[in-house]
């Protein structure tokens, strides 16, 4: 953090009460004459109920969700800018974060830089205004699972319900209709071309 800029603060605090370093939380509150905007970065994988390896770049939902609640209730913050560069991750955690952003009464803007893949799509459209950089990419794909599947019919039904939750969220928070979103999600030729 630049100590010569008193109008820029870092998000979060240590238990001791001092400001938490920007590199720790990836967020900053920027004060200008026009208002106070909190920037939040969502990068790497969205970490949910399973811990990811310590060398993986992650966004932890247990850090982001209370921060979003605090921002919504704060009289000192006028709006939220979400900077996204994520490969996706935990569906439940990603949808939880997206629902919180979508339910905020303050102005919210999302900007996809690099990538907004998988569960990053609902996160991208959760803000009241969403933008994607010309050099960025987004991947829409059906819900998938790594590992052993026991009870295939039950697992398939569960996947269908999760996919429907994602589809409903995206169509409710964007201008895409269900048929178009489903068609894009199932274009396996496009996905193969995108990821090689």
Predicted feature descriptions by range:
Residues 58-62, 91, 153, 157-161:
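Soluble non-cytosolic domains of exported or imported proteins
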Residues 63-66, 96, 161, 165:
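Extracytoplasmic/secreted proteins, especially bacterial periplasmic and envelope-associated proteins
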Residues 4-5, 17-62:
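STAS-typified acidic loop motif
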Residues 83-97, 102-147, 191-192:
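Glycine-rich beta-to-alpha active-site loop
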Residues 52-78:
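A short, well-ordered alpha-helical element
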Residues 80, 141-196:
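Charged, glycine-interspersed solvent-exposed loop segments at helix/strand-loop junctions
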Residues 39-41, 79-83, 111:
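Structural motif
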Residues 6-8, 12-21, 29-36, 70-73, ...:
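Catalytic phosphate/metal-binding cores of nucleic-acid and nucleotide-processing enzymes, i.e., regions
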